[in-house]
Amino acid sequence: MSIAHIVDWRLYVVTDAGLSRGRSHRAVIEAAIVGGATVVQYREKHASTRQMIEEALELRDLTRRAGVPLIVNDRVDVALAVDADGVHVGQDDMPVALARRLIGNKLLGVSAHNLSEALQAVRDGADYLGVGPIFATTTKPDAAAPIGLDGLRAIRQHVSIPIVAIGGINQANAADVMRAGADGIAVVSAVVAADDVTAAARQLRALVSVTQEKAL
């Protein structure tokens, strides 16, 4: 049985070595957790497998002590090696159904850019969706065209599993994203590249929480 519906998805922080301004993943995530990060995704596209395992183990130690789920992007082998809480796969990564067979009951997130991809991910066994990009983003140069708040609403109307919105989300638009139906926001540069990571995370967490409370 999936634990996705009891996970606090409000502030999902994704690592990015290229944006962290020379700070280690550990330093950035430690500060983000202090600021209120509720989920952490380890995303590393350029390191060796050995380095990824070493870095993910460090994050696993941090997140476990904080009670925050650790998700590994794409690499099922790394997630299993460090006993992460889950894996997140994109449309060009390992097929969702195969990832599910390999990871068992761990959390499985899937990126979706439109309703068709979202519905297929649900059928294949996704626990949650990473929907976007909502807005234009410079974090992923190869990102698809933004789907906007209307695209997010359309997916929300047809799926019941948790949705984490991603892509160009920051302090100026986080509340709008939550009002459009997201269960949480996934952020990269808005936290990882901030001068004060803890303060940036705290501000975003507060915005998301207030918006959720008003919706109840």
From Swiss-Prot:
It comes from the Bacteria. HAMAP family: TMP_synthase. Pathway: Cofactor biosynthesis; thiamine diphosphate biosynthesis; thiamine phosphate from 4-amino-2-methyl-5-diphosphomethylpyrimidine and 4-methyl-5-(2-phosphoethyl)-thiazole: step 1/1. Belongs to the thiamine-phosphate synthase family. Keywords: Magnesium, Metal-binding, Thiamine biosynthesis, Transferase. Binds 1 Mg(2+) ion per subunit. Its cofactor is Mg(2+). 2-[(2R,5Z)-2-carboxy-4-methylthiazol-5(2H)-ylidene]ethyl phosphate binds at residues 137-139, 168, 188-189. Mg(2+) binds at residues 74, 93. InterPro entries: Aldolase_TIM, ThiamineP_synth_sf, ThiamineP_synth_TenI, TMP_synthase. This is Thiamine-phosphate synthase. It comes from Chloroflexus aurantiacus (strain ATCC 29366 / DSM 635 / J-10-fl). Its EC number is 2.5.1.3. GO terms for molecular function: magnesium ion binding; thiamine-phosphate diphosphorylase activity.
